[in-house]
Amino acid sequence: MAGATSSIIRENDFEDELAESMQSYNRETADKLALTRTESVKPEPEITAPPHSRFSRSFKTVLIAQCAFTGFFSTIAGAIYYPVLSVIERKFDIDEELVNVTVVVYFVFQGLAPTFMGGFADSLGRRPVVLVAIVIYFGACIGLACAQTYAQIIVLRCLQAAGISPVIAINSGIMGDVTTRAERGGYVGYVAGFQVLGSAFGALIGAGLSSRWGWRAIFWFLAIGSGICFLASFLILPETKRNISGNGSVTPKSYLNRAPILVLPTVRKSLHLDNPDYETLELPTQLNLLAPFKILKAYEICILMLVAGLQFAMYTTHLTALSTALSKQYHLTVAKVGLCYLPSGICTLCSIVIAGRYLNWNYRRRLKYYQNWLGKKRSKLLEEHDNDLNLVQRIIENDPKYTFNIFKARLQPAFVTLLLSSSGFCAYGWCITVKAPLAAVLCMSGFASLFSNCILTFSTTLIVDLFPTKTSTATGCLNLFRCILSAVFIAALSKMVEKMKFGGVFTFLGALTSSSSILLFILLRKGKELAFKRKKQELGVN
């Protein structure tokens, strides 16, 4: 049973670093073991394993651009709508609470759709689900541009969110397919950073379009843009799911999973399509619509999703409140309201990109420390067990205290960033309440946003690390928490502002988020043991 346990656990992506370090044995120990041998063993020829991914650095750059372009239309659909909330309110003769419902339903379906569509992406492949998602979104945008009643707006906003929202989770899956853990933080950060351009500049774009051509122009813009995005995805987005295309060198059997770009000779040569690495194909993932609920059973995952979800909810609530406050308290035009979203947007973009680069640096630093520590522990165990290499290897592989702490590598700075963003949002709320100069409101909005979305990169990268074969499903669960909590707070925003004013609302949200961040200490101390135990239970290993 011990041997079987070792072979199974070794296959877990969570143990990648352990496998790496086991390959580089201490030179002194190797010399000692060599002295005990009495027979000369002829060395076997070295077999070079195929690379984790055949996608070149330049091709990965293309993937980043395409994923970000697709994800852009998911993030912008929410932000581009904020400047016209007051316009929609007047157009359909509804109150502030009802116009906020159009934002709430968008977040609800933005959370629900990826939770289930992620399973299709993990089993049927990334490419088909992305193409279907864009088509649904394209149709919904045309419908919204032609909508004549409030009810039509509500229904089509639901369809719009359900259509495009899965691509955010699928993009994380694509990055997980083509990257190693050492480089993943940077790539996830870049994709998330460019995706968030929609949130960063969506309000500005929406304000410009609506002030010039009316509120319907924003949906025509989204329809035209998503149509172009569909053509680009259809032509160049390859299938990356490893049970379908391996490391990228295996041509998918289904034509739905084949990108036309693969017929180009340079691409075929680069990906080794004529000499595929079949050994990199993973076992097929069965479609299981209940898989998200199994992921949510994990204690450590629920903690991570709660903390990240509350932070994201506070960020989106601040964006919604900003539109209302600027138009009603500062009496700004739609175009000026859009400009006021720039500080938040630019700081959000900077924070996500910098957070991704930090993750790569911190991962390398902690991995180097871990390998040195493990080398010393291995040498000590060899002395205690008469240089029995196999026994020592089994001990290390089956004791969680010897595993690399991926939670520390990904979440170490999160507590500080959460406290800073919560403080910034609290100050932002009180600036609006006391009608401070507009510059003060925008400075606090930018400061809070600079630290707010770091947790997005930290949590997404960690989720991809923990669920390498179910990345879209797992990221969809994270998205569910974020969007449902956002919907709850935005739905209650107008009532809360009536009772507590903006200052009280954001003080409450800041206190809630800061308090929840304390739970991260559980993950830093016990996360790797919880994940190790969960993985063994999933594999049926005692």
Curated annotation (Swiss-Prot):
Transmembrane segments: 68-88, 101-121, 128-148, 150-170, 188-208, 217-237, 301-321, 334-354, 414-434, 438-458, 473-493, 504-524
A GO molecular-function descriptor: monoatomic cation transmembrane transporter activity
Highest taxon of the lineage: Eukaryota
Subcellular location: Cell membrane
Membrane topology, from the record: Multi-pass membrane protein
Family, per entry: Belongs to the major facilitator superfamily. CAR1 family.
Protein name per Swiss-Prot or TrEMBL: Quinidine resistance protein 2
Species lineage: Eukaryota, Fungi, Dikarya, Ascomycota, Saccharomycotina
